[in-house]
Structures are given as C-alpha cells and as structure tokens.
A protein has these predicted regions:
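A short core secondary-structure module
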Residues: 1-29
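Active-site PLP-lysine loop of aminotransferase-like
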Residues: 6, 37-38, 77, 154
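Short, charged, solvent-exposed linker or helix-capping segments at domain edges/interfaces
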Residues: 14, 29-31, 55-62
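Short, solvent-exposed coil/turn linker segments
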Residues: 8, 21-22, 53-54, 108, ...
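Alpha-helical interface subdomain recognition
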Residues: 45-50, 61-186
Length: 186
C-alpha cells in the first residue's frame, strides 16, 4: 500500500491510499535494511517514478489515506508493545531458570535478596505491561481510536522491556553477554 497526494490543496485530507504491485513499471524496491530488531517486518526503500495506477486500486474513499495510515500506526504501536511483553516474559523465565541453577558459595543465586528483588521488579513490569496492552487492544477491538493509548502503551512497555532485559543480563553476569545464553539476544 502506498500513500499519495491526490488533492495537494486539501492537505492531509488530500492523501489517498493505493495498492500497487511491486513489479509495476516505475516501481523500484530497495534492499532490505539489516536492523537490530523487528526483523520480521521488512524495511526497504520504495521508489515510484512515473507510476500509473488505476482508480480501482484505491483503498477506501479518496482522501482517506492519512486516516488509514494513522490507524495502521496505532495498530503497530500496540503490536510492538505486545512483542515487548513476550520478550520480557522470556527474559524473566530464563533468569529464574538460570538463578535456580547458578550457585555462588554453594547457594543458588535465586536465594540472594538482590536477585529476588530484580526478579520481582521484572514480574511487576511484565504484569503492568500486560494490563496496559490488554486495555489498549480491547479499546481497538471496540473500534475506539487509540492514538494516545497506543503511544502510551508502546512507550511504557518498551521502557519496561529495556529494564527487564537489562536485569536479565545482570542476573546472568558475564554470561549475559555471551551468545551461548538466550538473554544476549533479547
């Protein structure tokens, strides 16, 4: 889907969405970006030079492109937050498993108060994030526009994911940086 000005004088209300075949004459698809994360979603340059598009390829009514793009952005914010919750849960699961197995002075490190505090903080952030994601998704399912809620959700949950994964690396110690252990990639 591409978004183009069909009525430049109308500002954002003059943008329309079109389905355009990537093999159409005048369309060039650039190389995929090698990103740090979100590799499931491809990021590429799309170049349009003198591309002719039939009116039947328009998505929705003329001038609705900006609204469609913003709806997609709201959805993507909530989905990014959902992915972050999954990453956090994996970080916690791996951390608990490791803390039960790893011994310091013949005692599993899970018995250390600081490790327990880190694990508890991780669990709190995960639960709060899940609640925020669920609330945002319920609003979306009800057809409510979630510009504010989607932004809050993505920001809060992403920040929590950074803290949770950092704590996981701390619990793993030097092994947290090793590719042999799963928290390195989180």
């Amino acid at each position: 889907v591409g978004f183009f000005k069909t009525n430049p004088a109308a500002g954002h209300k003059g943008i329309s969405a079109f389905i355009i075949d990537a093999d159409a004459p005048g369309v060039t698809v650039g190389a995929h970006e090698n990103k740090m994360g979100l590799r499931l979603s491809n990021t590429t340059d799309l170049i349009f030079e003198n591309v002719r598009v039939k009116a039947s390829a328009m998505v929705g009514p003329e001038g609705s492109g900006f609204k469609l793009a913003m709806n997609a952005l709201n959805l993507s914010r909530a989905f990014v937050a959902t992915l972050a919750v999954g990453i956090m849960q994996r970080a916690l699961d791996e951390s608990v498993k490791y803390a039960k197995e790893r011994k310091q002075f013949n005692t599993p490190i899970i018995k250390l108060q600081m490790v327990q505090q880190m694990l508890a903080d991780m669990a709190i952030k995960i639960e709060a994030s899940r609640c925020l994601v669920n609330n945002t998704m319920k609003m979306m399912d009800a057809g409510i526009m979630v510009q504010k809620e989607g932004s809050i959700c993505k920001t809060f949950v992403s920040d929590c994911a950074q803290e949770v994964t950092s704590n996981a690396v701390q619990i793993f110690g030097g092994y947290g940086y090793s590719k042999e252990y799963p928290v390195e990639k989180l």
